[in-house]
Amino acid sequence: MPIQIDRNKAESVAPQFDEALELVRNEFGGLDPHRQYRNAFARLLKPDPLGRVLMMGTDQRDMFAPEVRRAIETSVLSDGHIFDFGAGDGQTFALVADALPRGTRVSIEEPNPEYLANYLAFLKTKPHLRLGMALAAAFDEIDAAAELSGEKLPSDGSIDLSLALHMLYFVNDLPASVTRMVRFLKPGGVLFVVVTDETVGYTGLALKSFIEHGGDTGDNARHLSVIAERRRLLGLPAEGGGAIAEVLGAAGTPVEIDVRRQQSRLYGHNLADLIALSAIALLASVESLEKFETAAWLLRHSPEAVDLRIEDDGPRKGMWSVTQPQWVAALRRTR
């Protein structure tokens, strides 16, 4: 069983928290938000040298990748077409690429040109797949960017499976963006969404701690409201979520929605890793090191809130961890 850390245990190792925060200050001080994010996110991507898990810093991909494969099996036939939104550099897609039938076209939207180039390079190594279109643009700008570049987007009603894997944090209007994504689907097509529940997850609680201690994200009220909105729209219906189905029905793109909660976590080899990981979400845009100070305070003084513990078995034995649950949702267009 994992070793749970309560307030008393946290106080008993108070010097470790102090040292961890000092190390984080030393590493991140003087870095702009982009480089801060790069260093923090690197903790998530740490490879397992023994290949037992996909990455050491989280089990989120380990949990959702099999679900993506199941969505492929039930949604994509030979010569089908998938659309990967906010696609990244192809590392996540690589986990499921071999499950796609021969002749599948892959269309890609990704705002980072370097990531897009890496994705395209990977796609060339998969002879059973074909490139549909590739657009270097944020999803909110997808239609305008396609028109400006001359790139032809997939037609509405043409996509078998769309992927929105941990990318909905970066859209400005969640209901409008999901509606646009579903419009691409053919009847029976699926939009597969993965998003963290930050109402109870570590990064969301770190944001709240930052704000409660007087921190300013530039728009505190909005950043807190979008966390609640994601839960209302995409969370489990039994927990007051699933409202996206009503939104899509009103927009003329009705769906059947299947949502599952996965009790995923974030992991660090030490407390400094966990403090740094607080900056991989909405706090990424904040340059002040105060965000790390309030995350350290949260871990030390409210360890139960983030389910702080030390793993004592499996490939992450000896690592510290905190809760970071995710929702996996399949939205199947009905007409």
Task: Please describe what each predicted stretch is.
Residues 12-72:
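Class I SAM-dependent methyltransferase Rossmann-like catalytic core
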Residues 190-222:
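Conserved class I S-adenosyl-L-methionine
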Residues 145-162:
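A short acidic, Gly/Pro-enriched loop at the edge of an enzyme's catalytic core
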Residues 175-190:
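A short glycine-rich, Lys/Arg-flanked "PGG" loop and its adjoining helix->strand segment in the class I
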Residues 159-175:
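A short SAM/SAH-binding and catalytic strip from SAM-dependent methyltransferases
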Residues 229-252:
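Short alpha-helix
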